[in-house]
Amino acid sequence: MYDLLIIGGGAAGFYAAIQANIENPKLKIAILERGKTVLGKVKVSGGGRCNVTHAAFDLITLTENYPRGKKELLGPFHSHSTGDVMAFFEERDVPLKIELDGRVFPKSNSSPVSYTHLTLPTIYSV
């Protein structure tokens, strides 16, 4: 029996599971994915470099990227936004860089770095 089921084994699903585990380490969490592999897009995102987030730090600017849900996203983005995502990787020794167009990538230009940090079962009980 699980306390939390996360539907979708992509980057957002794994990140949500990790954040839930950080908030409550005793949670039993399962990630359900209907595809053949989990985190498949992470390995190819940004031409194999893994676009981690976008450097929109102003919440209004950030919500403009989501025209169908910008009002609904203001609340969640007040709780967890771009800076939090970047801090997650940097606190785990994944230095990031911001490109001219605002995309944020690992300085290593390697998606396996991001992939590894999203799938550390010894740290996160997922």
Can you describe what each PLM-predicted range is?
Residues 1-10:
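Beta1/beta-strand and adjacent pyrophosphate-binding region of the FAD-binding site
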Residues 13:
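N-terminal Rossmann-fold NAD(P) dinucleotide-binding loop
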Residues 17, 21:
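Gly/Ala-rich phosphate-binding loop of Rossmann-like dinucleotide-binding domains
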Residues 22-42:
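Glycine-rich FAD pyrophosphate-binding loop
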Residues 36-38, 43-44, 52, 56-59:
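An anion/pyrophosphate-binding glycine-rich loop and adjacent beta-alpha core
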Residues 49-98:
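Glycine-rich active-site loop/strand segments that organize a redox cofactor
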Residues 74-81, 102-115:
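Short beta-strand to alpha-helix junction loop
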Residues 117-126:
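Single conserved hydrophobic/aromatic residue that forms the stacking wall/gate
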